[in-house]
Amino acid sequence: MKKLFLWLTLLIVFIAVLAYSIVFSKFGNELIASYIENKVNNPQQNIKFKVTNFRLRVDSLDFNAVINENSNISVNGALSIWNRWVDLKYDIKITDLSILNNLINQNLKSELFTNGVFKGDYQSAIIQGFSNIANSETKYNLVLKDFKIKDILLELKNAKIDELLNFMNKPHYLNGDLTINANIRNIDNNNLDGKLIANISKGQLENDVINKEFNQTFSSKINIDGDIEASFLGKNAEIKTQLLTSIGNLILEKTLVDLEKDRVVSDYKFEVKNLQKLESVLGRK
């Protein structure tokens, strides 16, 4: 019985040493890097993903990869396999997001640079970083619970609206700058809690695109500035909207949205100081 116990102990130790040598050794790292490359490249036709550095140890990770020779992903820092926590820094530079559309099941365009930290364990973690999305100055802080986003703190400053539309692969309806400040402490649709403030400045409609997409006949330039304030509580949202345009002003003091029932109730006021400015919109005098 003692010999059997001894042999079982030796077998367990051998398996543990073998697993360590495979996973955390140079040979094992090369196998993992090759697996990652194949996993990304095989389903794609327009991606050449190459892992240039992969070093995984029990307490650290260094990872660098190149996509199509002009985009880079870098992740490095400390981790604990046994305690399941990480303290990692990331730096991502993608020059053309459209190459990832099949991989992420989203239809995106433009470029994306972002860097930050990912810190925490499997129960609670944060992702905090910066981005230049749509030529903006953006800060974000995400709180994760059980690997699901719970809280969002976002500061998006002076994003170019036309570049945001291009980012989402949408027609170029509008030019201008967009600033958003959002503090959502719970994104559960049944128990929302937070606020969002958005500002549009220097906005101008692209008449050619509007006319084509919506079968309109706009001819005069339409400038837009606007402010939106939204409060979220439970399953409801309350929104105040003010849009100031060169043809008139649209003001919605109180819009109530029932997110569960998809129901909207709102007041509105549309002010026009010069009816002649509506001629190009209405198509008649």
Positions of predicted regions on the chain:
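Residues in intrinsically disordered, low-complexity segments of regulatory proteins
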Residues: 6, 81-84
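Hydrophobic lipid-interacting interfaces of membrane-associated proteins
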Residues: 33-37, 41, 45, 52-82, ...
